[in-house]
Amino acid sequence: MPHRGPVLIADVPDLEAVLRGCFLQDDVVYVTRYHDALAALTHRKYRLIVIGLHFDHSTMFELLRVIREHDEYKKTPVVCIRALPSRLTDEARHGIRHAMLLMGAQAFLDFPPGPAVAERICTELRRVTDEGVGGS
């Protein structure tokens, strides 16, 4: 698969290897702190942005808000994910998904822990981004 453009991933250090592995053909910028994400947004144009629920003490909502306020990123696909164990109820996860979509995310992908979770994460990220980005 040819290189399709830079991807910004904002999530916790524990998921870096897994999430980078989902985009082996892309130029990935991986950040673990909110201010690094803001700096990254000003230095390049990304074709896709992935934000984890647990990113920098749960600043996923704030980062998505800032991204959507940038004219340059109004149409950039943003996928939010939960890939670490949490104590959220089904209702809370549903509420987060609903809020993310209302705020302009393309999707909120929820991955409960279990066997082959890394493979499931990559499969779903590819599916959602291929549908929404169209390979551009």
How should these model regions be labeled?
Residues 119-136:
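The C-terminal output helix
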Residues 42-44, 68-75, 103:
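Conserved phosphotransfer cores of two-component systems
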Residues 32-48, 52, 56-58:
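Acidic, metal-coordinating helix/loop segments flanking the phosphotransfer/catalytic sites
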Residues 32, 84-124:
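Output/docking surface of receiver
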Residues 18-22, 40, 99:
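Alpha-helical interaction/dimerization surfaces of two-component signaling modules
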Residues 12-34:
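Two-component/phosphorelay signaling modules centered on CheY-like receiver
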Residues 51-74, 82-83, 88-95:
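Conserved phosphotransfer microenvironments
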Residues 10, 76-83, 110:
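Short beta-strand elements of ligand-binding domains
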